[in-house]
């Protein structure tokens, strides 16, 4: 019976449902052994168990697939087992059991030869594949160990890096703390050195400056008698005076009880004795001239006096009189309303513009009249002088506005608030023009029927004097309160002062004008006969020549 190399197809009996049955590996091995050795020559079970122990156990593919699905972590081992089993079946010829096995088993004997050859081939292939499977398992184990070692190495590296980072952080913190401590030490050392230098400078200045006696000019710094400074005796003026102080009580009731706040008055000693020097406020004493320098206590504690023998003595009555005079003479500052304040500012501006110009215009008219000028010439001269004085007035205003750097503002004293400067200027200019035109207009229109020059001058003098006295009284009113005790005296003084000024100005101007007119006529500098000009009044009666000057 010839052996063929092709695979033997063995068919098993089909089930009732028509599905084929897959034979297990152990059953297949038993079947092959029975085909190879025969039914009677099958080796004992012990030998087969040894062979099974040495050989790898067959693995069912369905079980392997289920394990792969259930546990993904054992994929490598399952794949190796599946590869080993597939190699077992792939190297040998596949065996397909297609034959139907009858209950008698007659077909088994006819095909024993071919099955024996297939069994031998399968054993040889399984024996050759066993070491390959073991090698793969070893390799997989080694790979797992290598991976574990790498993971351990990575963990150790990460731990070492973390430790190094922590050490670096700790080192930086320590360095920062050390740096702060060094800076604090440097600052302390610098401050100590500065204090030492300041002390040295202070000691040096103390050595350079010494105290000298104001009486004998001797250096008394090294010979100073230091004494404690004690407070003097104080008396409360609102209460009854002590009986040990001699005070003469007046018959009339005193005003001491009516004082609102009590006044503490210093009662000095009558004489400074050697045993009573500690009671005074002595600071130092000159040993050469016996000069004693002390601070007076009580109401004049800020005054420093140096004396010989005894201090300045004052009685209690003097201090009370001073206090009473202070309370009666001084009045609290009055707050004026805006309307009254604005009216006072207008009066100030009127006085500032008209007072001086009235006196100036009076002098011009009196001097021109004394020189023999006509009425028309006097009026023209007065108006020209008035126009030229406006420039001077503007310059005075500019000086007042620029005088804000001084401690006492002259602008506010003479005119008022700076915010109302435009109104002040307007009122002052109007007053300047009005009071400046009064003397020439009075001279022109007074005694126009008679035309006597002396009468005209008297009328101009009286009109100007009234204007000046009025402006002087306004000046007193805006500078002093009306309810003061000396207001009447102030008005009288102002009237007398400005009357004297008007008289002096008018008299001096008249005298100088008369003298200059006579002197010019004597020199014949402007004589009418020399220049062949006839007078406009030539051949006219005196009664008809009264208004020829106009």
Curated annotation (Swiss-Prot):
It comes from the Eukaryota. The gene is MEB2. It is a multi-pass membrane protein. Interacts directly or indirectly with NAI2. The chain crosses the membrane at residues 374-394, 425-445, 458-478, 500-520. May sequester excess cytosolic iron and manganese into endoplasmic reticulum to reduce metal ion toxicity. Not essential for the accumulation of ER body components, including PYK10. It is found in: Endoplasmic reticulum membrane. One of its GO terms (cellular component) is ER body. Residues 122-132 have a biased composition (Polar residues). Keywords: Coiled coil, Endoplasmic reticulum, Membrane, Transmembrane, Transmembrane helix. Residues 153-166, 185-198 have a biased composition (Basic and acidic residues). Disruption phenotype: No visible phenotype and no effect on pathogen sensitivity. Residues 80-105, 112-121 have a biased composition (Low complexity). Residues 134-165, 393-418 form a coiled coil. Induction: Induced by NAI1. The keyword Lyase does not apply. Residues 46-199 are annotated as: Disordered. This is Membrane protein of ER body 2. PROSITE patterns: HMA_1. Belongs to the CCC1 family. Residues 143-152 have a biased composition (Acidic residues). GO terms for molecular function: iron ion transmembrane transporter activity; manganese ion transmembrane transporter activity. InterPro entries: ER_body_metal_sequester.
